């Protein structure tokens, strides 16, 4: 994958931080950081598609992360798709200004290191913060921590919900924290754009060696979070324009099309129980839309936590229904057992049972499958 961040946004961020640091004593700059690691292994246990599919993957196979084209292929134990290592560093310039960067090396991208975050934070008031640079798109509950395996119960997040062409953006966001009665609230508004060159997401549909750029421009959105005791709720709306550049065909950039996304999350943790639900709806002009949802229930038994998850994806198409790539539909039922080794490390075992109800193209290339994965996660 080539450069996946905006030079302009990073230069602006660095210039802003450098200018601020010149007005502060060098000794006042405080550097902190934390690392994270996931070592994962998986094996395909079965599936209905045999041999190399039309996109170059050896099947039976199963997608664990659409955004990174993380796919477990048949032929023994695979370590690449979900393994990763990363580091997040922060430089605090003064009480008002800090700068954060995060780099991640993924097995799904053959160890290539990408700069996922690079943003500055300026505290306007104790409740309000302006951030600028490169950040995660806040599409889901675990969006900000989706690279940190220790932060969530699964070996890999439910691919039916956590899987889109773009996961980051370059721009601005304004965070405001407050209270609504006894409830804590956070309002996050954001604007920006994303250009993802040689987008791995497109490999799944066009092939491992086929190059397509993805652009989301004129991004504007907001998310609102409420929390009280063991209840957390979240709603999100985002709109943008989207287009692709089919490099290998030589057709260039396609026309920009408007898209809208609505998301909602609910997290409940009464006593030792963990219950979560997420959904995302999309609408794209001259295309149709998508529906994605997942529901999980688990329970803590001291250091152990078993969990079951049902995740669904449905593609709703209103044009060009003869296109064999359209109308993708599938359900994944997963069983996870997590054991916390320490306060900063765990091991997990996950069994996925992927059931496909898609069009002939997707069914003949991916179909249904069973996948067993195990991981060791830690933060340091």
Regions found by a protein language model. Name each.
Residues 2-12:
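Bacterial N-terminal signal peptides that target proteins for export
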Residues 79-85, 112-116, 166-170, 216-220, ...:
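Residues that define the transmembrane beta-barrel architecture of outer-membrane proteins
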Residues 121-123, 143-145, 235-380:
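Outer-membrane beta-barrel pore domains
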Residues 28-67:
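Transmembrane beta-strand segments of Gram-negative outer membrane beta-barrel proteins
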Residues 18, 23-25:
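N-terminal signal peptide c-region/cleavage motif recognized by signal peptidases
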Residues 30, 60-61, 124-130, 165-304:
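Signature for the C-terminal beta-barrel architecture of outer-membrane proteins
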Residues 30-32, 40, 74-194, 225-228, ...:
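Outer membrane beta-barrel
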Residues 63-68, 94-100, 106, 148-156, ...:
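Flexible, solvent-exposed coil segments and beta strand-coil junctions
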């Amino acid at each position: 994958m080539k450069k996946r961040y905006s030079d302009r946004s990073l230069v602006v961020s660095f210039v802003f931080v450098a200018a601020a640091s010149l007005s502060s004593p060098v000794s006042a700059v405080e550097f902190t950081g934390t690392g994270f690691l996931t070592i994962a292994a998986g094996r395909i246990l079965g599936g209905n598609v045999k041999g190399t599919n039309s996109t170059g993957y050896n099947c039976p196979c199963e997608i664990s992360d659409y955004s990174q084209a993380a796919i477990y292929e048949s032929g023994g134990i695979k370590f690449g798709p979900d393994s990763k290592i990363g580091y997040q560093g922060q430089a605090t310039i003064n009480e008002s200004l800090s700068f954060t960067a995060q780099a991640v090396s993924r097995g799904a991208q053959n160890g290539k290191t990408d700069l996922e975050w690079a943003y500055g934070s300026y505290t306007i008031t104790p409740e309000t913060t302006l951030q600028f640079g490169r950040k995660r798109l806040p599409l889901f509950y675990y969006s900000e921590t989706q690279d940190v395996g220790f932060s969530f119960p699964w070996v890999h997040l439910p691919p039916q919900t956590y899987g889109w062409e773009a996961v980051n953006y370059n721009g601005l966001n304004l965070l405001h924290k407050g209270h609504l009665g006894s409830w804590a609230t956070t309002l996050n508004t954001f604007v920006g754009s994303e250009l993802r060159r040689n987008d791995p997401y497109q490999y799944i549909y066009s092939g491992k060696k086929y190059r397509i750029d993805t652009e989301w421009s004129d991004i504007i959105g907001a998310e609102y979070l409420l929390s009280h005791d063991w209840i957390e709720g979240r709603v999100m709306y985002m709109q943008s324009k989207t287009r692709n550049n089919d490099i290998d065909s030589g057709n260039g950039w396609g026309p920009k099309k408007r898209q809208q996304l609505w998301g909602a999350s609910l997290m409940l943790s009464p006593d030792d129980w963990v219950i979560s639900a997420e959904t995302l709806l999309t609408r794209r002009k001259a295309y149709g839309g998508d529906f994605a949802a997942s529901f999980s229930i688990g329970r803590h038994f001291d250091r152990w936590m078993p969990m079951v998850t049902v995740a669904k994806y449905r593609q709703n198409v209103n044009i060009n229904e003869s296109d064999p790539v359209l109308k993708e539909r599938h359900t994944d039922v997963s069983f996870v057992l997590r054991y916390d080794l320490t306060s900063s490390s765990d091991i997990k075992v996950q069994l996925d049972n992927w059931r496909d109800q898609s069009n002939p193209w997707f069914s003949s290339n991916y179909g249904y499958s069973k996948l067993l994965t195990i991981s060791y996660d830690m933060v340091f």
